[in-house]
Amino acid sequence: MGRNPLIIGVTGRIASGKDTVSKIISNKYGFYEINADKLGHSVLHEKKEEIVKIFGQKILNTKNEIDKLLLRNLVFNDNKELKKLESVSHPVILSKIKKILIQNQSTKIIINAALLFKMNLEKLCDYIIVLKAKNSIIKNRLSYSIPNIDSNMINKILKIQKDIFFEKNIINLKIINIINNKNYAYLEKEIEKKMQGIINYERFE
């Protein structure tokens, strides 16, 4: 596989600001965003038969499509079920990401992925922005963005995602930590500072 000019990973728990940060960097600095979550949604269609075979007809809605809410409730209530889903989805997502990188070899890339380390995507990145936020702030954001999500489910998701950054020793990687507990204007300024540091470093490498 050829090498893109610059690849930045953006990771963090649910509602930590991954999409917002990726959008800022894409728009301001000319990066192409690869959104692993969106690729994961496409896998539900592509691997529908295999997923239904694993979890049964109970995950289908009235249109005979996989109901994302039903599937989410199922896998976040049982870690074994989550691993079954990941065993199907992760190899496909990884393959899609590598294909996009090949198709855009002259382009600067953002890889937006909550499970960046779990999927070994850090191996593709020059820098990784790790977003963190207080649980209380994450819960408020989720209550606003997903009105029908209950606090029980939020707690289960946060518990599962608790250690997504620390599953392995991180060496030879440029990690950039950002605490996203404030407003958009503050986050935008933080991103500008971090990106200027990256640009300056790359210029003299």
Curated annotation (Swiss-Prot):
Its EC number is 2.7.1.24. ATP binds at A15, S16, G17, K18, D19, T20. Residues 7-205 form the DPCK domain. One of its GO terms (biological process) is coenzyme A biosynthetic process. Pathway: Cofactor biosynthesis; coenzyme A biosynthesis; CoA from (R)-pantothenate: step 5/5. It catalyses: 3'-dephospho-CoA + ATP = ADP + CoA + H(+). It is found in: Cytoplasm. GO terms for molecular function: ATP binding; dephospho-CoA kinase activity. It holds the Pfam family CoaE. It comes from the Bacteria. The keyword Signal does not apply. The keyword Cytoplasm applies. Its main location: cytoplasm. Keywords: ATP-binding, Coenzyme A biosynthesis, Cytoplasm, Kinase, Nucleotide-binding, Transferase. It is an enzyme of class 2 (transferase). GO terms for cellular component: cytoplasm. InterPro entries: Depp_CoAkinase, P-loop_NTPase. PANTHER family: BIFUNCTIONAL COENZYME A SYNTHASE-RELATED, DEPHOSPHO-COA KINASE-RELATED. Catalyzes the phosphorylation of the 3'-hydroxyl group of dephosphocoenzyme A to form coenzyme A. Belongs to the CoaE family. This is Dephospho-CoA kinase. The gene is coaE.
